[in-house]
């Protein structure tokens, strides 16, 4: 088992077209009949096509374009499609660029499989000024269930402003998932969240 893995955990891309079916067919390389059509969309769009956590939002307003959103499981769903086609994320992202996609947000996740990143120690060192830090904005969150024990509390640490174009999120993925009744091999996760405008 690798101690660390890197993955894309969230992606939002806007395309300069009003044709959502074109994006499904040519960028996602999926069949539109696999998608559920809804007469409402996210982010002010008029309609959306949904396949699990893959969402393609469309509007007749050409200035809005088509917005592709992949949440965590949507990224995993797309990875299965890419594997079946024998291609990788690099090829897919290049295809987005070929279709003049504008990347509005991308989250890169480093998965710590062995527990090498200790979130509590990282928080303590940050507060004690024992790390170089460009951003002075931070937020610490402890989450869990009231019925649980202190050991069930999952720690999250944000570095940077959530309103900026880049910020970091470090959290105890295994404990977070356990509180939801989900088993995972990922102990901790470090996310780099990059975004460009609304």
Please annotate each region the language model reported.
Residues 1-198:
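Structured, helix-rich domain cores that form ligand/interaction pockets
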């Amino acid at each position: 088992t690798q101690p660390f893995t890197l993955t894309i955990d969230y992606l939002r891309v806007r395309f300069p077209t009003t044709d959502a079916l074109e994006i499904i067919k040519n960028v996602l390389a999926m069949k539109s009949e696999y998608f559920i059509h809804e007469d409402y969309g996210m982010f002010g769009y008029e309609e959306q096509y949904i396949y699990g956590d893959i969402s393609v939002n469309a509007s007749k307003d050409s200035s809005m374009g088509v917005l592709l959103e992949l949440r965590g499981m949507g990224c995993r769903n797309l990875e299965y499609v890419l594997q079946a086609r024998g291609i990788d994320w690099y090829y897919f992202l290049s295809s987005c660029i070929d279709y003049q996609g504008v990347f509005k947000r991308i989250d890169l996740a480093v998965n710590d499989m062995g527990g090498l990143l200790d979130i509590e120690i990282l928080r303590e060192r940050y507060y004690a000024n024992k790390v170089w830090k460009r951003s002075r904005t931070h937020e610490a969150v402890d989450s869990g269930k009231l019925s649980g024990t202190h050991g069930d509390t999952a720690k999250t640490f944000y570095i940077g402003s959530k309103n900026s174009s880049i910020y970091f999120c470090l959290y105890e993925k295994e404990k977070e998932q356990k509180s939801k009744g989900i088993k995972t091999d990922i102990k901790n996760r470090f996310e780099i969240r990059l975004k460009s405008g609304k």
